[in-house]
C-alpha cells in the first residue's frame, strides 16, 4: 500500500501533448472521471484517488495552458472551439470543486489506512528476547602450548623424507628385506607431532 504522497506522484505521471485538440482532452477527462467512479465503487481507494487527482490535475494545470483555450476570443461565439471552451469552464466551475472534496476525503482514508499498516508492521518486527535472569555465556579460550623449535626433531623429519624419496627412486631393487627395512625406518623415524590437550 502507498501513502497519498506516493499516489499523487503516480497520478501526475502522464504525458500531456498540447498538439492534441481540446475536444479530445475533454472526452479523456470524462473517461478518467468514469474510471475513478468505477474504482471507487469497487472499493479500490488508491486507484480512485489516482484517477480523481489526475482528472483535477489535467483540468486545472495542463488544459488551462492549452493553445486552443489561449487563442479564443468572444467574437467566435458560434464556432465549435467556443463550445469546447464553455464545456471546459463548466467542468472547472461545477465538477472540480466536488472532485476536490472527494480527493480530500480519500486522502484522509488512505493516510489513515497507511499509518495503521505502518504501525502494524512495526509491531510485528521480531525483537530480541532479553531476560534479566540469564547471564551471557563466556567462552574461555585455552592458551596454545608453548613449544620452542626442536632442531633434533626437525633434522629427524628431514632425514625421514629423504629416506622415503631415496627408496622410491630405487624401485629396481625391491626385495623383501628392503621393504621391511623401509617399514622399520618409517616406524622409528616418523616425526613427532605436537600433542593436543583438551581441558574438561
UniProtKB/Swiss-Prot annotation:
Record GO biological process: ubiquitin recycling
A GO molecular-function annotation: cysteine-type endopeptidase inhibitor activity
Key words, A-Z: Endosome, Protease inhibitor, Thiol protease inhibitor
UniProt main location, coarse: other
Record's keyword annotation contains ATP-binding: no
Record keyword Cytoplasm present: no
GO CC list: endosome
Compartment(s) where it occurs, according to its Swiss-Prot or TrEMBL record: Endosome
Function: Inhibitor of the DOA4 deubiquitinase involved in the regulation of protein degradation by the proteasome and maintenance of a normal level of free ubiquitin.
General remark: Present with 377 molecules/cell in log phase SD medium.
UniProt family annotation: Belongs to the RFU1 family.
Quaternary data: Interacts with BRO1 and DOA4.
Record's protein name: Regulator of free ubiquitin chains 1
Record organism: Saccharomyces cerevisiae (strain ATCC 204508 / S288c)
Amino acid at each position: 500500500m502507498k501513502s497519498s504522497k506516493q499516489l499523487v506522484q503516480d497520478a501526475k505521471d502522464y504525458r500531456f501533448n498540447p498538439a492534441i485538440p481540446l475536444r479530445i482532452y475533454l472526452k479523456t477527462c470524462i473517461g478518467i472521471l468514469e474510471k475513478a467512479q468505477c474504482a471507487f465503487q469497487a472499493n479500490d481507494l488508491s486507484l480512485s484517488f489516482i484517477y480523481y487527482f489526475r482528472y483535477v490535475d489535467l483540468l486545472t494545470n495542463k488544459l488551462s495552458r492549452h493553445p486552443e483555450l489561449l487563442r479564443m476570443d468572444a467574437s467566435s461565439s458560434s464556432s465549435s472551439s467556443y463550445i469546447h471552451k464553455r464545456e471546459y469552464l463548466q467542468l472547472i466551475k461545477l465538477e472540480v470543486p466536488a472532485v476536490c472534496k472527494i480527493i480530500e476525503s480519500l486522502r484522509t482514508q488512505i493516510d489513515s489506512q497507511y499509518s495503521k499498516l505502518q504501525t502494524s508492521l512495526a509491531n510485528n518486527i521480531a525483537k530480541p528476547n532479553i531476560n534479566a535472569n540469564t547471564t551471557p555465556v563466556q567462552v574461555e579460550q585455552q592458551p596454545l602450548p608453548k613449544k620452542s623449535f626442536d632442531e633434533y626433531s626437525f633434522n629427524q623429519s628431514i632425514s625421514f623424507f629423504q629416506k622415503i624419496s631415496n627408496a622410491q627412486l630405487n624401485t629396481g631393487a625391491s626385495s623383501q628385506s628392503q621393504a621391511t627395512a623401509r617399514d622399520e625406518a618409517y616406524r622409528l623415524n616418523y616425526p613427532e607431532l605436537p600433542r593436543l590437550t583438551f581441558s574438561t
